[in-house]
């Protein structure tokens, strides 16, 4: 699998671009809020290390972790089908599907971690019922 570096040597950072580094944290909050909103208005990327309002960061963490939880919970019904698959080929297909869903969840957990939350915190929230996931997985999966 290919990865992309955060800073490409082929692209020179532009002034005000997210690649030019994080926002100065010593600026007044109103000025930082203005910069943040101007970036959004200009449809520029907001990187995890950039300044953002705490409510915005929490919302991103909630959305990304909910998506990650849904990927992980979504593989559970398919995992129970593996032993019931009629052939080795179908078992391999189900295994690949489960592995794919797990990989999606892990990528999303890693993305949420860049926003400043630990994976253990997200999993504890899921296990305690404080975090949500897609409810489609609560219905019986007929085989």
Which positions does each model-derived feature cover?
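Non-heme di-metal
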Residues: 2-143
């Amino acid at each position: 699998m290919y990865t992309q570096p955060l800073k490409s040597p082929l692209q020179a950072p532009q002034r005000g671009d997210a690649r030019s580094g994080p926002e100065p944290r010593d600026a007044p909050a109103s000025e930082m809020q203005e910069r943040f909103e101007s970036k959004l208005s200009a449809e520029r990327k907001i990187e995890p290390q950039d300044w953002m309002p705490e409510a915005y960061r929490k919302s991103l963490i909630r959305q990304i972790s909910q998506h990650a939880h849904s990927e992980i919970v979504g593989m559970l019904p398919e995992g129970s089908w593996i032993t019931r698959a009629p052939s080795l080929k179908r078992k391999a297909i189900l295994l690949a599907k489960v592995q794919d869903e797990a990989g999606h969840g892990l990528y999303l957990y890693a993305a949420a971690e860049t926003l400043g939350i630990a994976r253990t915190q997200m999993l504890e929230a899921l296990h305690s019922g404080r975090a949500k996931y897609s409810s489609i997985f609560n219905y019986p999966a007929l085989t």
